[in-house]
Amino acid sequence: MTIAFYPGSFDPMTNGHLDVLVQALNVVPKVVVGIGIHPGKVPMFSFEERAELIATSLGEAVPLRAGDVSVIAFDGLAVDAARQHGATLLVRGLRDGSDLDYEMQLAGMNRQMAPDLQTVFLPAGTASRPITATLVRQIATMGGDVSAFVPPQVSRALKSRLKT
Protein backbone atom coordinates (compact mmCIF):
# COMPACT_ATOMS: atom_id res chain seq x y z
CA MET A 1 0.00 0.00 0.00
CA THR A 2 1.32 3.43 -0.92
CA ILE A 3 1.58 5.80 2.03
CA ALA A 4 2.07 9.56 1.71
CA PHE A 5 3.55 11.77 4.40
CA TYR A 6 2.21 15.33 4.63
CA PRO A 7 4.39 17.42 6.98
CA GLY A 8 3.64 20.87 8.35
CA SER A 9 3.01 22.85 11.49
CA PHE A 10 -0.75 23.13 10.88
CA ASP A 11 -0.97 25.92 13.47
CA PRO A 12 -3.79 26.23 12.71
CA MET A 13 -5.04 23.99 9.91
CA THR A 14 -6.31 26.13 7.05
CA ASN A 15 -8.64 25.42 4.15
CA GLY A 16 -5.50 25.23 2.02
CA HIS A 17 -4.05 22.46 4.20
CA LEU A 18 -7.36 20.62 4.07
CA ASP A 19 -7.55 21.01 0.28
CA VAL A 20 -4.09 19.48 -0.17
CA LEU A 21 -4.88 16.66 2.27
CA VAL A 22 -8.08 15.76 0.42
CA GLN A 23 -6.20 15.84 -2.89
CA ALA A 24 -3.58 13.49 -1.44
CA LEU A 25 -6.33 11.09 -0.40
CA ASN A 26 -7.52 11.08 -4.00
CA VAL A 27 -4.06 9.84 -5.05
CA VAL A 28 -3.06 7.38 -2.31
CA PRO A 29 -4.93 5.07 0.05
CA LYS A 30 -3.24 6.31 3.24
CA VAL A 31 -1.81 9.65 4.41
CA VAL A 32 0.22 10.27 7.53
CA VAL A 33 0.00 13.92 8.59
CA GLY A 34 3.16 14.88 10.42
CA ILE A 35 2.90 17.84 12.76
CA GLY A 36 6.37 19.26 13.14
CA ILE A 37 7.33 20.13 16.70
CA HIS A 38 9.97 22.85 16.73
CA PRO A 39 11.61 23.59 20.10
CA GLY A 40 12.23 27.24 19.17
CA LYS A 41 8.60 27.96 18.31
CA VAL A 42 5.68 28.45 20.65
CA PRO A 43 2.57 27.24 18.83
CA MET A 44 -0.88 28.72 19.31
CA PHE A 45 -2.32 25.21 19.63
CA SER A 46 -0.73 22.16 21.25
CA PHE A 47 0.03 19.06 19.21
CA GLU A 48 -3.04 17.35 20.65
CA GLU A 49 -5.27 20.30 19.75
CA ARG A 50 -3.89 20.49 16.21
CA ALA A 51 -4.29 16.73 15.75
CA GLU A 52 -7.91 16.94 16.91
CA LEU A 53 -8.65 19.92 14.63
CA ILE A 54 -7.18 18.05 11.66
CA ALA A 55 -9.16 14.90 12.42
CA THR A 56 -12.41 16.80 12.95
CA SER A 57 -11.93 18.94 9.83
CA LEU A 58 -11.19 15.88 7.73
CA GLY A 59 -14.13 13.99 9.20
CA GLU A 60 -16.48 16.75 8.12
CA ALA A 61 -14.90 17.20 4.67
CA VAL A 62 -14.56 13.55 3.65
CA PRO A 63 -16.10 11.34 6.34
CA LEU A 64 -15.58 8.12 4.39
CA ARG A 65 -11.81 8.71 4.13
CA ALA A 66 -11.08 10.10 7.61
CA GLY A 67 -9.94 6.65 8.77
CA ASP A 68 -7.27 6.63 6.06
CA VAL A 69 -5.37 9.46 7.76
CA SER A 70 -3.24 9.27 10.87
CA VAL A 71 -1.71 12.27 12.63
CA ILE A 72 1.68 12.04 14.30
CA ALA A 73 4.18 14.43 15.86
CA PHE A 74 7.78 14.61 14.70
CA ASP A 75 10.71 16.73 15.80
CA GLY A 76 13.43 15.85 13.32
CA LEU A 77 13.72 15.74 9.57
CA ALA A 78 10.51 15.18 7.62
CA VAL A 79 12.25 12.55 5.49
CA ASP A 80 13.16 10.56 8.60
CA ALA A 81 9.61 10.76 9.96
CA ALA A 82 8.22 9.76 6.56
CA ARG A 83 10.46 6.69 6.43
CA GLN A 84 9.59 5.74 10.03
CA HIS A 85 5.93 5.63 9.03
CA GLY A 86 6.45 3.65 5.83
CA ALA A 87 5.79 6.51 3.43
CA THR A 88 7.18 6.54 -0.09
CA LEU A 89 5.67 9.89 -1.04
CA LEU A 90 6.19 13.29 0.56
CA VAL A 91 3.25 15.63 -0.11
CA ARG A 92 3.80 19.36 -0.44
CA GLY A 93 1.19 21.97 -1.30
CA LEU A 94 1.92 24.82 -3.69
CA ARG A 95 0.16 28.18 -3.66
CA ASP A 96 2.26 30.16 -6.11
CA GLY A 97 5.60 30.52 -7.86
CA SER A 98 7.44 31.57 -4.72
CA ASP A 99 6.28 28.36 -3.02
CA LEU A 100 7.52 26.41 -6.04
CA ASP A 101 11.00 27.93 -5.85
CA TYR A 102 11.35 27.08 -2.16
CA GLU A 103 9.73 23.66 -2.47
CA MET A 104 11.98 22.68 -5.39
CA GLN A 105 15.04 23.44 -3.27
CA LEU A 106 13.59 21.47 -0.38
CA ALA A 107 12.66 18.56 -2.66
CA GLY A 108 16.20 18.47 -4.03
CA MET A 109 17.71 18.34 -0.55
CA ASN A 110 15.20 15.71 0.55
CA ARG A 111 16.03 13.63 -2.54
CA GLN A 112 19.71 13.72 -1.59
CA MET A 113 18.94 12.57 1.95
CA ALA A 114 16.23 10.06 1.02
CA PRO A 115 16.45 8.90 -2.62
CA ASP A 116 13.66 6.38 -1.96
CA LEU A 117 11.20 9.13 -1.05
CA GLN A 118 9.44 10.97 -3.90
CA THR A 119 8.12 14.50 -3.40
CA VAL A 120 4.68 15.16 -4.91
CA PHE A 121 3.46 18.73 -5.36
CA LEU A 122 -0.27 19.38 -5.14
CA PRO A 123 -1.59 22.79 -6.17
CA ALA A 124 -3.81 24.69 -3.77
CA GLY A 125 -7.27 25.45 -5.06
CA THR A 126 -7.92 28.97 -6.27
CA ALA A 127 -9.85 29.97 -3.15
CA SER A 128 -7.11 28.81 -0.78
CA ARG A 129 -4.05 30.16 -2.59
CA PRO A 130 -3.69 33.38 -0.57
CA ILE A 131 -4.16 31.62 2.77
CA THR A 132 -1.30 31.04 5.20
CA ALA A 133 -1.53 29.90 8.79
CA THR A 134 0.61 32.90 9.79
CA LEU A 135 -1.87 35.34 8.24
CA VAL A 136 -4.79 33.47 9.78
CA ARG A 137 -3.20 33.78 13.24
CA GLN A 138 -2.47 37.48 12.70
CA ILE A 139 -5.99 38.27 11.50
CA ALA A 140 -7.59 36.26 14.32
CA THR A 141 -5.33 37.85 16.95
CA MET A 142 -6.43 41.30 15.74
CA GLY A 143 -10.09 40.34 16.06
CA GLY A 144 -10.73 39.66 12.37
CA ASP A 145 -13.05 37.04 10.97
CA VAL A 146 -11.08 34.08 9.59
CA SER A 147 -14.05 31.81 8.91
CA ALA A 148 -13.49 32.01 5.14
CA PHE A 149 -9.93 30.71 5.54
CA VAL A 150 -10.24 27.79 7.96
CA PRO A 151 -12.60 24.87 8.59
CA PRO A 152 -15.52 25.74 10.93
CA GLN A 153 -14.10 23.92 13.97
CA VAL A 154 -10.77 25.73 13.55
CA SER A 155 -12.60 29.06 13.43
CA ARG A 156 -14.41 28.16 16.65
CA ALA A 157 -11.16 27.06 18.31
CA LEU A 158 -9.46 30.33 17.34
CA LYS A 159 -12.35 32.39 18.71
CA SER A 160 -12.31 30.40 21.94
CA ARG A 161 -8.54 30.69 22.30
CA LEU A 162 -8.47 34.43 21.66
CA LYS A 163 -11.56 35.58 23.55
CA THR A 164 -10.83 38.05 26.31
Swiss-Prot record:
Binding-site list for substrate: S9, K41, A78, R92
Cofactor(s) annotated in UniProt: Mg(2+)
Enzyme Commission number: 2.7.7.3
A GO cellular-component term linked to this record: cytoplasm
Domain of life where this protein originates: Bacteria
Residue numbers binding ATP: S9, F10, H17, G93, L94, R95, E103, S128, R129, P130, I131, T132, A133, T134
Top enzyme class: transferase
Main subcellular location: cytoplasm
GO molecular function: ATP binding; pantetheine-phosphate adenylyltransferase activity
Gene Ontology biological-process entries: coenzyme A biosynthetic process
UniProt site positions, description: Transition state stabilizer: H17
InterPro entries, A to Z: Cyt_trans-like, PPAT, Rossmann-like_a/b/a_fold
Key words, A-Z: ATP-binding, Coenzyme A biosynthesis, Cytoplasm, Magnesium, Nucleotide-binding, Nucleotidyltransferase, Transferase
Localization of this protein: Cytoplasm
A Pfam family the protein falls into: CTP_transf_like
Catalyzed reaction equations: (R)-4'-phosphopantetheine + ATP + H(+) = 3'-dephospho-CoA + diphosphate
Pathway the protein contributes to: Cofactor biosynthesis; coenzyme A biosynthesis; CoA from (R)-pantothenate: step 4/5
Family designation: Belongs to the bacterial CoaD family.
Subunit structure: Homohexamer.
The protein's role, per its UniProt record: Reversibly transfers an adenylyl group from ATP to 4'-phosphopantetheine, yielding dephospho-CoA (dPCoA) and pyrophosphate.
PANTHER family named in the record: PHOSPHOPANTETHEINE ADENYLYLTRANSFERASE
Protein name in the entry: Phosphopantetheine adenylyltransferase
